[in-house]
Amino acid sequence: MIEVLTTDSQKLLHQLNTLLEQESRCQPKVCGLKLIESAHDNGLRMTARLRDFEVKDLLSLTQFFGFDTETFSLAVNLLDRFLSKMKVQAKHLGCVGLSCFYLAVKATEEERNVPLATDLIRISQYRFTVSDLMRMEKIVLEKVCWKVKATTAFQFLQLYYSLVHDTLPFERRNDLNFERLEAQLKACHCRIIFSKAKPSVLALSILALEIQALKYVELTEGVECIQKHSKISGRDLTFWQELVSKCLTEYSSNKCSKPNGQKLKWIVSGRTARQLKHSYYRITHLPTIPETIC
């Protein structure tokens, strides 16, 4: 597939090469993520479960505001980069998560779509002030070396999808649905384990699984070409495909806790909005956050 290049394919491959070159930069520290995964839940320490719940809350906010998946992916990247470097107490996680989310929103969304910090805090039902949020933003920025933008799995998913989609017969193109792939990526982001995968590997694992499920044999060669071009080993791809498959199976079951978008809709209903007092008057100010490095 990649050997015979159209002008559009050449542009896509140029973009892919740029992403591959930048991929290793601005990613979470795997050793830090492993520490979180191994932590016991005592109500004080950061754990994988708490991290995953926070990401689900960020996904609910993303859906509520209608933000792009790239915004959500970047917010998760920032959160995991910070958590993998710093020892964060559970009581500070909401402020950290919302700060990462707000940074991602301001970096990717149009300025007119960026909500006020006061509105974001109120809708999220957190009990901290705008000054707390701004202070946490500065801490996050310092710990990620002021590098907000990063290469994400969503960017790879877009490119990989574009490379294979146009090779399908016209009548079958609608079956390989990008929104479905986006939803699968969001589900994976809600599990900390997938932040240990390279963004390119996670994206290709999701796409390859979907192609297998649709029995698109004609795209197998294309996936193999992308895999080779991206220098992804067969072992790595198989390993992460199995984990993605397991995650999606669990996510589609009733046992899985899914993001609660309805809760946010209720919070800002007309009746509720009239009853809400300004957040400042019911604030419990956060204590100074110790900047302890892992």
Swiss-Prot record:
Q: Cite a single GO BP annotation.
A: cell division
What is the native source organism of this protein? Mus musculus
Look up keyword Metal-binding and say if it applies: no
Q: What does this protein do?
A: May play a role in growth regulation. Is associated with G2/M phase arrest in response to DNA damage. May be an intermediate by which p53 mediates its role as an inhibitor of cellular proliferation.
Keyword terms, alphabetized: Cell cycle, Cell division, Cyclin, Mitosis, Nucleus
Please state what the protein is called: Cyclin-G1
What gene is this protein a product of?
Ccng1
Q: One Pfam family, short name please?
A: Cyclin_N
How does this protein assemble?
Answer: Binds to B' regulatory B subunits of protein phosphatase A (PP2A) following induction by p53 (in vitro).
Superkingdom per UniProt: Eukaryota
GO cellular component terms, semicolon-separated: nucleus
